[in-house]
């Protein structure tokens, strides 16, 4: 599929027809009628438009019955960087050494023992479970400012990770990836180009190559119902270490 995108004559409808044909014979490619909400808990739906991302995140939280003012254990997050003054370079390096770099996939485990701290599972890290000062931002449709249920004065910043833009997904990979095709169709209809290539082709290439083993090409604006409540049972649970800012920093 990625190779096919190099054909200058290939249109969006032709590409979708190829996906549909391949899906009939190859279980690694799925022509999907809806976004699978269970998958979003550990592998974000990939979208082009920011509005789609925010809408899917809020739909995800809604079907799981997540309260507006707090996170449920098991909700996915994406690290959006470290918000620390330059003088605290060592603390920044400590956080980054534990895997909290921009774009890192994280699962929320619960509130930490100290105000502003969250217990987190950093996906792929050697010691994945930590407690860190956190600034967690939940964006909502038609609201300019995100809601911040957990905010330390400084620390690691996070966005919700149930959906992410394809641009932000560059450099990341997941076993199974869901691509929200209506967004790519919109990009194709607009006729936009990027670096001399149709934008939809660049988006499609990045999106499908994020998948390590399975691709779901979602063609309808629908969301499945969860098969179970959000939980953290799939994560290896250990006592998280405190990755704290120095005590004087918090005063």
Named regions from a protein language model:
Residues 118-250:
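C-terminal accessory regions
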